[in-house]
Design a protein with these regions (language model features):
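Conserved alpha-helical substructure of the radical SAM core
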Residues: 1-129, 227
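Flexible mid-to-C-terminal extensions adjoining Fe-S/redox cofactors in radical SAM and related proteins
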Residues: 2-18, 23, 260-263, 280-281, ...
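Radical SAM enzyme [4Fe-4S]-AdoMet core and its adjacent flexible, acidic
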Residues: 124, 133-135, 140-268, 274-282, ...
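Cysteine-centered iron-sulfur cluster-binding motifs in ferredoxin-type domains/subunits
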Residues: 30-38, 269, 319-326
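Short glycine-enriched, charge-decorated loop/helix-capping segments at active-site entrances
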Residues: 48-57, 144-150, 214, 337
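Short loop/turn motifs at secondary-structure junctions
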Residues: 38, 74, 126, 167-168, ...
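Residue-level signal for the nucleotide or nucleotide-sugar donor/cofactor binding architecture
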Residues: 58, 89, 150, 178-181, ...
Length: 362
């Protein structure tokens, strides 16, 4: 989850400085784990009874208090997510409460619940971006993957309502065995609608379901490598051959000259955080190695605890020294979700990157 996409140069510079200083400049708040769809690969969804047994959802006042504490600690960018955030009873109230605090807000949604009335209140003070997860290019794919036979039509209606009001939209798409056949149409649709799209070929195992390393609902490493290749073909078009040549040149010339040091290799836990619906703060939605509840000890203490944990975490030395790392997307979250430990190499990612290099070289 990325609360700081679509940055201007000044904002990018701020975020880079926050990384170096350990300032929590950006966060994600999961408002609830409930959803109106039932996607096969979902890592977050709970039933209402499961949620209540674990922790009831927190109120507007509780979240607005945490938002105030986070703002004082340096947070500027916030992503509101779920579950499906448009199921949260006080979303509009919380959204505008945080807007008044000066937050730059984005929202993650499946888009199926956005009607004209919802689009109207969003348009009064639009989010930086409304990120819609696009699961396919037909109602049939939505039926098979998400259990919603009208999902695609609902999303297209939402897009129409949002575009009428000049609300910035971005599509996110994660490829699975259930929607890989729609890849070309998904990309074509984003181009026709002039909506930027981020298509993911790597699917994290559902760590919350105690399914570490579970591959049932994701592509094999070889399939994911092939998908990555095709995504880049679509993205770069006529410049694809030049992109491949440049990537392979970087790979062949790469030598690790930086000394190994502890810490995560991304922004998670360095300047970005995730807060589960129950209030537990972690570096990322997929890291399970350190949780601290913001409602128990306050935001600043929770952030400092996670930040110090991240700074002292030992990621695999093998990954640090690996020549493929220049083309590999491995991170702490992939190590934890693949193996249950940050110290172990995420072999699925190794295989994926190796297959990808073979595809590009040939």
């Amino acid at each position: 989850m990325d609360p700081i996409n679509h940055l201007n140069p000044i904002e990018q510079n701020l975020c880079n400085k926050a990384d170096l200083a350990g300032i929590p400049i950006a966060g994600n708040i999961e408002l609830l784990p409930l959803c109106n769809m039932d996607c096969k690969m979902c890592f977050a969804k709970m039933t209402r009874s499961q949620m209540e047994a674990h922790s009831p959802m927190h109120t507007y006042q509780e979240w607005i208090d945490i938002a105030g504490q986070a703002s004082e600690a340096g947070t500027i960018f916030m992503l509101l997510t779920g579950g499906e955030p448009f199921l949260y009873p006080d979303l509009e109230k919380l959204y505008y409460g945080m807007k008044r605090m000066g937050y730059v807000l984005s929202i993650n949604t499946n888009g199926t619940l956005i009607d004209a009335e919802t689009a109207d209140w969003l348009a009064e003070d639009p989010p930086r971006r409304l990120n819609i997860t696009l699961y396919g290019s037909s109602d049939e794919t939505y039926r098979n993957l998400c259990g919603n036979p009208h999902g695609f039509s609902q999303v297209m209606n939402a897009v129409e309502q949002l575009k009428k009001r000049d609300i910035s939209i971005k599509f996110n798409c994660s490829l699975t065995p259930y929607n890989i056949h729609d890849l070309e149409d998904i990309y074509r649709l984003s181009q026709e609608l002039e909506i930027p799209i981020d298509i993911g070929y790597y699917m994290f195992p559902p760590v919350r379901s105690n399914n570490i390393g579970n591959v049932q609902y994701r592509l094999t490493a070889m399939e994911a490598a092939k998908a990555r290749y095709r995504i880049e073909e679509l993205r770069y078009g006529a410049a694809f051959d030049d992109y491949v040549a440049y990537s392979l040149k970087k790979y062949r010339e790469y030598e690790q000259t930086e000394p190994y040091k502890a810490g995560y290799t991304c922004r998670s836990g360095n300047s970005v955080y995730w807060i589960n619906y129950d209030g537990t703060l972690s570096a990322c939605s997929f890291t399970t190695d350190c949780f601290v509840n913001v409602f128990d000890c306050g935001f600043k203490t929770a952030w400092d605890t996670v930040y110090n944990h991240v700074k002292n975490s030992q990621m695999p030395l093998e990954c640090h020294n690996c020549k493929m790392r220049i083309l590999c997307g491995y991170c702490a979250a992939s190590a934890i979700s693949e193996n249950g430990s940050i110290h172990k190499v995420p072999r699925y990612y190794c295989d994926l990157t190796r297959y990808y290099i073979c595809w590009t070289a040939n």
